[in-house]
């Protein structure tokens, strides 16, 4: 399991953004719990052969798929494509396949997550933003065991579904 190359060197501004994410994320989780916040997101499982691409955010320890919030007026697929471009620099007319949805209570909010799959013969050079996304790795199925993963990724992979969560 090795880190995939980053596109550019980290700057002082990048470090400030990472600090803002690390401070802001726990505060946002408290806010979501207090407001009983609902959220809709889209995540993309990127496969290169049997390996799966996972990304690490600057503000959490778990690994995740590229993806994020579905904005108002945006379809889940549009959100998935936008997030791929923003987080890892992957843009283009590649075939995203919708593979299902999951609902759960993650990070203190009720979350509906739309899952997509993208299958590639080879991984193009990734352009990590060095602010929100700080690492990306291709992981073999055997390496997934014991890794810290976000709740939605664990559900996608068929791990034990926590109480209050379900998938379709």
What are these regions (language model features)?
Residues 91-101:
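A short coil-to-beta-strand element that immediately follows conserved catalytic motifs
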Residues 49-51, 119-124, 141-143:
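Short loop segments at secondary-structure junctions
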Residues 4, 61-62, 130-168:
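Nudix hydrolase/Nudix homology domain
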Residues 2-43:
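Acidic, metal-coordinating catalytic segment for phosphate/diphosphate chemistry
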Residues 102-125, 137, 160:
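Active-site-adjacent beta-strand/loop module that shapes the phosphate/pyrophosphate-binding cleft
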Residues 36, 44-45, 106-107, 125-130:
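Short secondary-structure boundary/capping segments
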Residues 42, 47-86:
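Conserved Nudix-box catalytic region and its N-terminal flanking loop in Nudix hydrolases
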